Amino acid sequence: MNNPLVVALAYDGLCTFEFGIAVEIFGLARPEMGDNWYRFAVAGVEPGELRATGGIRLMVDGGLELLAEAGTIIVPGWRGADVPVPAALCEQLIAAHQRGARILSICSGVFVLAAAGLLDKRQATTHWRYTDLLQQRYPAIQVTPDVLYIDSGDVLTSAG
């Protein structure tokens, strides 16, 4: 039995809607999907207590070290398009991608993938309110507005 590990990122200021999508899809038992359904874990981007929007306390399964085991990594909507992405997170995402992990962003999580350089010379999408800003900041990305998602196989982006 091989249950691939899906890891969703959590961080202070996390948007619960996008995070909830990952939890609903991969975090619930799915016996109808067979024995090889995914394992699910939550990785804290930074140590210590994390609070999502609205002050909701988050419990994580570990830190960025979990990304080394993940077959799929989900980056929910980032805490703000103007908030810098930690270098350690970028490094872990690059390493995971290089070893073959799928990397997926939801909504403004695309800015994390862009900061890591994972979208250079690729098509990508995000929420319509961020498409112009994404294109301005990262001209090497082929921003495709007005689509719900772009699936490049190893990197996926969604509108959110």
How would you describe each model-predicted region?
Residues M1-I103, F111-A115, P145:
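Extended, subdomain-level signal for the structured scaffold at the beginning of enzyme domains
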Residues N3-L5, Q123, D154:
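Residues that mark the start of a beta-strand
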Residues I56-L58, P139, S158-A159:
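Short, surface-exposed amphipathic charged segments that create phosphate/polyanion-binding patches used
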Residues V83, A87-C90, T125-W128, D132, ...:
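Short, amphipathic alpha-helical segments
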Residues I103-L104, T125, T144, L156:
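Structural detector of well-ordered beta-strand residues that form the stable sheet scaffold
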Residues L119-L148:
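A conserved active-site-flanking secondary-structure segment within enzyme catalytic domains
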Residues L148-G160:
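Conserved anion/nucleotide-ligand pocket segment
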